[in-house]
Every structure is written in C-alpha cells, then in structure tokens.
Amino acid sequence: MVFYWATALYFVIVHGQRSKYSSVLVKNVLRNQIMYTPIYLIPFYFYPTPHSSWNAFWQLPGIVLLTDMIFYSTHRYFHHNKYLFTRVHKYHHTMDDPQYAPGALNAHPVEHIFVNLLSTVAPLFIVKANLYVSLVWTAAASVNVVVAHSATCENDAHELHHKYKAYNYGAGPLIFDRMFGSYKIENLKH
C-alpha cells in the first residue's frame, strides 16, 4: 500500500493529476486495500520459504511471466463473460479515468480478489518466492499499476484498453496479448 500511494501522490502533486471522481476512486481503492490486504498476507504466515539469492534470480522472471498470464486470462474472461463484465468489471471502466493514477485499483471487490490479487499473489506461491522477493514484487506491481493509469511514460497500450476495451488485457509486457491477437498499439497524443 505504501508504494501504491507514494507513487499515486507523486502523480497528483508533481503532475497535477485530477479527476472528477477522485473522492469516490480513492475511497474504493482504500476499501479494497484495507479489506483484502490482510487476506493477501495470511498465506505468507503459513507458507515460509527459504531465502536464497540464486532462487531470487530465476524467480522474478517467472513471476513476471505468470502474473502477465494470470492477469491476462482473468481480465479477458471478465471482459468476455457478459455477466461478469456488466455486474463486476464495468465498474472499473465506468468511473475510471485512465489518466488518474490514484484510481488505478478502483475495482469491484470480486474483481479485486480474482483479477488483481490473484494475479499478484499466485505467482509468488507457484515459484515458491521467499519473503524478500515477495516484497520486492508487491512493491513493483503496485508501482506498475499506478504508472499504467498515469498517462505518462509509455502506457498507451493500457490507455487504449480503456478506450476500446477489446485490446491489451495483460499487465506489463503484454506477452499473451501478442500471442492471442489482442495486442493493439497506436500513438496517443496527451
């Protein structure tokens, strides 16, 4: 949460980002983080893993690949399942301003669990990441989601997802979008 809000505040303070939905977006993001972060932490208590620099070396690329695969799959499913889109995922697209970084995790609680948290946490257990790798990954994922919703850097792919809704479902390298034909890029003028 610290890395998420530090990055989000950077875009609000330094870049002057504003949204007509800011109070609602911030409230929804805080609700999701406060309600579900403890659930996210429970498995780490019961599932300690050994610390090894060598393990960290191969775990991070595996985590990136698995996160992209899980996020792509669940996110695309939420788009293509009419019930899930209209009752759950549309919530993110309806009130979301893709250029307002603090609202990046504005999501229905069901989506937050099955898309956002699952894609961030499951890879850690699949590769048996140690606590340090898990903390680094969680911080990196938090910064990544905020930057993807900030209208800065090279996040046109995610902004196009919000514009067209049928492209760029993945997070990060968009490997699975490229593999399955849902990758779209065009230069957006900000």
Question: Where are the regions a protein language model picked out?
Answer:
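Generic preference for well-ordered secondary structure
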Residues: 61, 97, 142, 159-163
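Non-catalytic, topology-defining segments of multipass membrane proteins
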Residues: 1-124, 170-173, 177-190
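A cytosolic-side transmembrane-helix exit/cap motif
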Residues: 76-81, 152-162
